[in-house]
């Protein structure tokens, strides 16, 4: 079984090779050395990768899952909410699938 981080890295490289701009979303909370909690501020369910197509600037959001990974409820809600926007949104389990989502979306 492939680690999601490995799939994510291969997707980032392949989308960049295809001329797209892609960023990794770091989500979560961290306790700082001073004891305060730092929250990234992204909403629950925000996808692992986001960016825009190099050809037309259209935004995309990609949730990365391995072969057996399933969406959490928050991730399902984000995917559903994006359906009414002009942005591209999908779930990818490989670099080829991510390229297809972005370029055919």
Show which residues each predicted segment covers:
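Catalytic phosphate/metal-binding cores of nucleic-acid and nucleotide-processing enzymes, i.e., regions
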Residues: 1-105
């Amino acid at each position: 079984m492939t680690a999601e981080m490995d799939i994510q890295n291969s997707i980032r490289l392949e989308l960049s090779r295809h001329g797209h701009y892609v960023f990794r979303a770091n989500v979560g909370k961290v306790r700082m050395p001073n004891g305060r909690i730092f929250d990234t501020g992204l909403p629950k369910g925000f996808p692992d990768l986001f960016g825009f197509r190099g050809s037309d600037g259209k935004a995309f959001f990609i949730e990365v899952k391995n072969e057996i990974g399933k969406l959490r409820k928050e991730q399902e809600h984000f995917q559903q909410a994006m359906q009414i926007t002009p942005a591209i949104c999908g779930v990818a389990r490989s670099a080829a699938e991510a390229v297809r989502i972005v370029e055919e979306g």
